[in-house]
């Protein structure tokens, strides 16, 4: 689960991380209240969406920049008015962009130098890893590609926690002065506590800055949490912004389906994440474009299959459907019955290709064969993929 920058900074403050003073607003009337909380001078106006690249983004009406540095409150209010309710397109939103429904006003900071700092889960080592760089304010992927020697990594033993020597190592490699180093050490420890105690999957600050008076501030904040651990943090669940999520993905989660919308026109219904990714790959291989990732899991019920079809058909870009099932735990006949019920309920008019293999496959194929449905059978994954690509061409 992702949260907005203003929410992440509020969380940071609870752990003692220094952040610029700020205030969010959701309406033009709230602009006045929010700005009244801030001192006169430079104000940074930030669009709040769950995507990066806001500063370089463009709104659909042509207004450029989802982050604006303003010299006065009047200028900040004017910029916020152009952002609120507008749709911001960035490199991470896709062409559809995201509608801005919250504005975050920040007091401007005096920047001496910018850094990058993030805490992530390294699945290769099964440990948290702190990633830091002297090149802040830039895309970390570009830094890793162009100047990999400027990125430092410290893996943390979860049984022991973040050690003092590891903090000192980071402070030394990042080149902080003695005065800055004390504040940086405090901030790094606070960020790690925030990461660990909230079951976060990512805490990112880009940029982390030093100021002329030796302070170390989190100028930006991005936090994501492990969905599987949210039951331990009901206070974090309240921060979820459903407006930032695809309605189809929200509906899928209600039925315990793993769904991610994509930009293609061939919908996929598959059991198992690995098979789902392979199915998308083979569709691309034969010239098609997948419309989604949809894993119904190893023990889906008939009701879940019906729900999956309804979610798929909620995407207006879908021109055909490929069902690819390999039954291990999954009973192929349950899938087949779900397909029959779903098609009859929603009145499917799109091409449908079904490939079934594995547990109780004979009964599943018999159910489909006697259903009277207009569908195409696939003898193999490659055969099924070729058929659906041809049908939607």
Swiss-Prot record:
Its EC number is 6.2.1.5. Disulfide bonds: none annotated. Belongs to the succinate/malate CoA ligase beta subunit family. Its cofactor is Mg(2+). One of its GO terms (cellular component) is succinate-CoA ligase complex. Keywords: ATP-binding, Ligase, Magnesium, Metal-binding, Nucleotide-binding, Tricarboxylic acid cycle. Pathway: Carbohydrate metabolism; tricarboxylic acid cycle; succinate from succinyl-CoA (ligase route): step 1/1. GO terms for molecular function: ATP binding; magnesium ion binding; succinate-CoA ligase (ADP-forming) activity; succinate-CoA ligase (GDP-forming) activity. HAMAP family: Succ_CoA_beta (MF_00558). The keyword Transmembrane does not apply. Substrate binds at residues 271, 328-330. Binds 1 Mg(2+) ion per subunit. InterPro entries: ATP-grasp_succ-CoA_synth-type, ATP_grasp_subdomain_1, Succ-CoA_synthase_bsu_CS, SUCC_ACL_C, Succ_CoA_ligase-like_bsu, Succinyl-CoA_synth-like. ATP binds at residues 46, 53-55, 109, 114. Succinyl-CoA synthetase functions in the citric acid cycle (TCA), coupling the hydrolysis of succinyl-CoA to the synthesis of either ATP or GTP and thus represents the only step of substrate-level phosphorylation in the TCA. The beta subunit provides nucleotide specificity of the enzyme and binds the substrate succinate, while the binding sites for coenzyme A and phosphate are found in the alpha subunit. It comes from the Bacteria. Pfam families: ATP-grasp_2, Ligase_CoA. Heterotetramer of two alpha and two beta subunits. Residues 9-251 form the ATP-grasp domain. This is Succinate--CoA ligase [ADP-forming] subunit beta. The gene is sucC. Mg(2+) binds at residues 206, 220. The keyword Nucleotide-binding applies. It catalyses: succinate + ATP + CoA = succinyl-CoA + ADP + phosphate; GTP + succinate + CoA = succinyl-CoA + GDP + phosphate. One of its GO terms (biological process) is succinyl-CoA metabolic process.
């Amino acid at each position: 689960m992702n949260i907005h920058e203003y929410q992440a900074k509020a969380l940071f403050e609870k752990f003692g991380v220094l952040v610029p003073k700020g205030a969010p607003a959701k309406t033009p009337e709230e602009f006045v209240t929010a700005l009244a909380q801030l001192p006169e001078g430079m104000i940074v106006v930030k669009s709040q969406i769950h995507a990066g690249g806001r500063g370089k983004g463009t709104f659909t009406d042509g207004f450029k920049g989802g982050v604006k540095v303003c010299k006065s409150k009047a200028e900040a209010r004017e910029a916020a008015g152009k952002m609120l309710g507008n749709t911001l397109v960035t490199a991470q939103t896709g062409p559809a962009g995201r509608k801005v429904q919250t504005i975050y006003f920040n007091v401007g900071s005096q920047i001496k130098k910018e850094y990058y700092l993030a805490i992530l889960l390294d699945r290769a080592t099964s440990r948290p890893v702190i990633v830091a760089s002297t090149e802040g304010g830039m895309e970390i992927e570009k830094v890793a590609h162009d100047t990999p020697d400027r990125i430092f990594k410290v893996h943390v033993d979860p049984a022991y926690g973040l050690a003092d020597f590891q903090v000192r190592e980071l402070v030394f490699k990042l080149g902080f002065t003695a005065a800055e180093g004390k504040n940086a050490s405090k901030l790094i420890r606070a960020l790690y506590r925030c990461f660990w105690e909230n079951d976060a999957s990512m805490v990112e600050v880009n940029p982390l800055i030093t100021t002329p008076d030796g302070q170390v501030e989190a100028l930006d904040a991005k936090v994501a949490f492990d969905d599987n651990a949210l039951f331990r943090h009901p206070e974090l669940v309240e921060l979820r912004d459903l407006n930032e999520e695809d309605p189809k993905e929200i509906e899928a989660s209600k039925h315990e389906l793993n769904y991610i919308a994509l930009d293609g026109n061939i919908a996929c219904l598959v059991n198992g994440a690995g098979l789902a990714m392979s199915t998308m790959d083979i569709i691309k291989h034969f010239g098609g474009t997948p419309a989604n990732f949809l894993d119904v899991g190893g023990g889906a019920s008939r009701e879940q299959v019906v729900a999956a079809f309804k979610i798929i058909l909620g995407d207006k870009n879908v021109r055909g459907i490929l069902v690819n099932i390999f039954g291990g735990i999954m009973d192929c006949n349950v899938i087949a019955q779900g397909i029959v019920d779903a098609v009859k309920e929603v009145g499917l008019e799109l091409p449908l290709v079904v490939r079934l293999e594995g547990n109780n496959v004979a009964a599943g194929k018999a159910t489909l064969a006697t259903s009277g449905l207009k569908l195409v059978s696939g003898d193999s994954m490659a055969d099924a993929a070729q058929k659906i690509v041809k049908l939607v061409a």
